[in-house]
Design a protein with these regions (language model features):
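Long, compositionally biased low-complexity segments
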Residues: 33, 41-457
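Alpha-helical assembly-interface signal, strongest on the long, hydrophobic N-terminal helix that forms
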Residues: 1-53
Length: 457
């Protein structure tokens, strides 16, 4: 009897170990297929394609898997006359810890991305982004307000006032300024895309309800990052995640055919609910950067400064009132830098390159372009410096980490929901590691418990 009971106890323990392993791996085998196919991510969806996401669903799946393996139907050891030597039952399955993709600001998601791209050569990308961000910071492209500087010169012109001339005896009229800068500045209200694109109507106008997505709604919470997974695969790397985004998301000129929003990187940057608005945001930001850089350059170019003074000095109002010469010349220089910046944005949207800081050889527009801004802009796919994607990479690098991460998850939700059976898909319903507390018993009076941690790492 003692020998038989000892064998029974050993068999129960062994079977418990095997069944727990089979069950917990079976849960992981239910990973979300679309998430893997589209984004190379391994997560289990707690809703299992439904609208109710809860860890209780996974507990039920795990318990079912265990019970089926404890008491299998059919096979060699079942049927009439066959006695179960163990007769085991799953008493309890409790998942106390589980790492949801959005936990800790999305660190769970980014840990997996970092692990999957651990061999990616980052050196060249890092160097280009570092040099770009350093130049942007050095020259104040994000912080300098050239609009306010331009306004000061315009205010000075207004303070000086227009000269008057006698048009007939006793009748005096202001001499019109006819400042060429005014014609250029009048286009500022038109919108950058309308100025730089050959056919602005071709821009996507897809609109989404942003409140449906993870960055805008309340989120389910797991128990945070699995420290064991992080210790084995490494902590999340923001630069790796950024490189991953450019592999998995579309942007202007490189749109993803099956995506809901066509300008996904632009959405990550702007967070607007309409494609057009996201692209316009990026275009305006590019224009602002380029305008600061071009103002810095043009004010250092003595030939262009002299050209602007000559153009200002030829105006009748300036001839009649020499005090207007300096402020008018500077408004011309600022307007010229603005037109050059529009040309830069058009070049970038045409597949060309533009250096962050220019030399004389990089300058494209002439002073006469101020009178016919749109007509003077040309599509240019050449040049040196950075292209549109590389400017976007710098913008994404400068973006707040949380916005970058959760807007990226918005994109994932948008596109996964377009696939069959995933209409209610949520990133905050997906986990990649979990710890289960398991207990079984036998009708022979034995009971055992164990805790196991399983996951994708």
């Amino acid at each position: 009897f003692t020998v038989i009971e000892g064998a029974r106890i050993s068999a129960i323990r062994m079977k418990f170990e095997c069944v727990a392993d089979i069950g917990m791996n079976s849960v992981l085998a239910e990973y979300h297929r679309e998430l893997l196919e589209q984004y190379d991510l391994l997560f289990v969806d707690m809703s299992y394609g439904g609208s109710h996401a809860d860890i209780g669903n996974t507990e039920a799946h795990l318990k079912n898997y265990m019970q089926k393996n404890l008491r299998p139907e059919g096979g060699l050891w079942s049927g009439p006359g066959v006695r179960d030597f163990l007769t085991m039952t799953t008493d309890q399955v409790r998942i106390g810890q589980y790492s949801i993709a959005s936990d800790e600001g999305g660190s769970v998601l980014k840990r997996q991305v970092t692990d999957r791209m651990s061999d990616y050569p980052l050196g060249a990308v890092l160097e280009k982004i570092s040099l770009g961000t350093s130049e942007i910071d050095k020259y104040g492209l994000e912080s300098r307000d050239v609009g306010a500087e331009r306004s000061r010169y315009e205010a000075e012109i207004e303070e000086i006032g227009r000269p008057v001339e006698e048009v007939e005896e006793g009748v005096f009229e202001e001499v019109p300024l006819d400042n060429p800068a005014d014609a250029a500045n009048a286009t500022r209200s038109i919108g950058v895309l309308n100025m730089v694109l050959e056919d602005a109507s071709s821009v996507s106008a897809v609109k989404v309800d942003a409140n449906q997505y993870i960055s805008h709604r309340s989120r389910m919470q797991g128990t945070g990052m699995c420290r064991e997974a992080a210790s084995l695969t490494g902590e999340p790397n923001e630069l790796v995640f950024q490189v991953y985004l450019f592999e998995k998301c579309g942007y202007y000129g490189e749109e993803m055919e099956k995506s809901l929003l066509k300008y996904q990187i632009e959405y990550i940057l702007a967070g607007k609910n309409v494609d057009w608005q996201n692209l316009e945001y990026v275009a305006r930001r590019l224009l602002r950067w380029r305008e600061v850089a071009n103002v810095i350059y043009i004010l250092s170019d003595s030939a262009k400064v002299a050209e602007a003074h000559a153009a200002a000095g030829a105006l009748a109002a300036v001839l009649a009132c020499p005090a207007l010469l300096e402020p008018v010349a500077y408004t011309i220089l600022f307007a010229w830098a603005y037109v050059e910046s529009l040309q830069d944005v058009k070049t970038l949207f045409s597949g060309g390159r533009v250096p962050i800081m220019k030399t004389a050889a990089d300058w494209k527009t002439g002073i006469n372009s101020l009178k016919n801004v749109r007509g003077s802009l040309t599509a240019d796919s050449g040049g040196r410096g950075l292209n549109y994607k590389e400017y976007l990479q710098i913008m994404v690098f400068l973006l707040n980490q949380e916005k970058r991460t959760f807007r990226a998850m918005d994109i994932m939700e948008m596109d996964i929901r377009r696939t069959p059976g995933n209409a209610a898909f949520r990133m905050d319903a997906c986990f990649d590691t979990y710890e289960a507390e398991l207990s079984v018993s036998s009708r022979f009076g034995y009971a055992y418990e164990m805790t196991r941690l399983y996951g994708f790492y």
